[in-house]
């Protein structure tokens, strides 16, 4: 029988990148082309009015001194002040709004939308602008409605664990508040220092621990939202059970602002675990990753909180662009991060130690380490959470595909994508080839693969090679073209690969009920 071949992790230096940079502090040195220039098939819908000085004055009177407004029509305004609202964090999508509104209250949101609806002014709701599909920035000159100033935590019940808060509360701030009460927010994301809880709800973000805590569809108990005509929909209940008619709030979770603007949420939060363990494994094959996942679920059962998959390419990028070293001496084709969360430290350590011993004895994994303290735990998580930022440093851009697939075929998509790019003469080490490499990582626990193609520059040849081929591949294997990033602008043309014509028709029918003038989120979603 193998002895436990785990050693203490050598503390690494912190990532030199800021994973949680505030969006409004960013200045874009190299701005992307305007989205409407990159997407030639898109044309501004003439039914939408153009912003006037008179409109701006009305918005100023609505917001008053409480909120904030950036007026691009004012010649004294620095155009760069609107960049953080016009450009997504990947530096891929760029709108041309002349007005960013930051209301402070639900009533202000209501009055803004009522006026926009009457005047047929198009609106894009925006949270932390950390999205990956171009949903949170304008395509043309839509008004940006940013919820960042609506950031109050209103109530918390320490018995039930239900928190009521504004949609503009930063996810990390909400979790820090709950930590002081012995609770945690039931969602964790790599962008937690910038993303807002309302945006998380609007995109139905899954996060790192969906395996343990489920989706926001189950955690959100109540909601306040504003419809496009200004109607305030108050369903801010804190009840676990409410079986009185249709659960309307579910329509807004994952709607991306298509039906209205989420302004407040009530969320049930789990107790914060007193014991957390993290293991990091090197695995010789994807077949063994599947075996490791099965064994892990059997061994850890109720305390398993995360099972994250990373390929060797992703870890090579983290090595290169984070300035950190790998926790394992040798390179391996795949890596897995396993996390447990529980209430009994000794019990949890025994279970995860037994798991490692079993995986080594069965030769399912090649090597592994266990974090011995909080610092090492964070270091191991950075190997996973830092991938996205390191990809952004690898070249001039990244093509991102967030899909869900049956586990047996999940990584086949990465291999097939790489083969296809090579066949099309797009992937090579030389500068004349646009593609640098193909990276696969994701949430193994819920079948969510993040397929990333790092490029030296965005290139239409790459897009034509991959789209709709990737979506056809996913559809053929009974997967979903969007696991958690949403549809936005990027995936609107391809929703038919995951939803039937009848379902798309029903979604459009609901849109006409909630937003007959179509002012919310134009050119996107479905």
From Swiss-Prot:
Subcellular location: Mitochondrion matrix
Entry-linked InterPro entries: FAD-bd_oxidored_4_C, FAD-bd_PCMH, FAD-bd_PCMH-like_sf, FAD-bd_PCMH_sub1, FAD-bd_PCMH_sub2, FAD-linked_Oxase-like_C, FAD-oxidored/transferase_4, Oxid_FAD_bind_N
Reaction catalysis annotation: (R)-lactate + 2 Fe(III)-[cytochrome c] = 2 Fe(II)-[cytochrome c] + pyruvate + 2 H(+)
Cofactor names: FAD
Keyword rRNA processing: no
Single GO biological process annotation from the record: lactate catabolic process
Domain FAD-binding PCMH-type as annotated: residue spans: 93-272
The enzyme's E.C. designation: 1.1.2.4
Keyword Transmembrane helix assigned: no
One Pfam match: FAD-oxidase_C
Family of this protein: Belongs to the FAD-binding oxidoreductase/transferase type 4 family.
Record PANTHER family: D-2-HYDROXYGLUTARATE DEHYDROGENASE, MITOCHONDRIAL
Protein name: Putative D-lactate dehydrogenase C713.03, mitochondrial
Species this chain originates from: Schizosaccharomyces pombe (strain 972 / ATCC 24843)
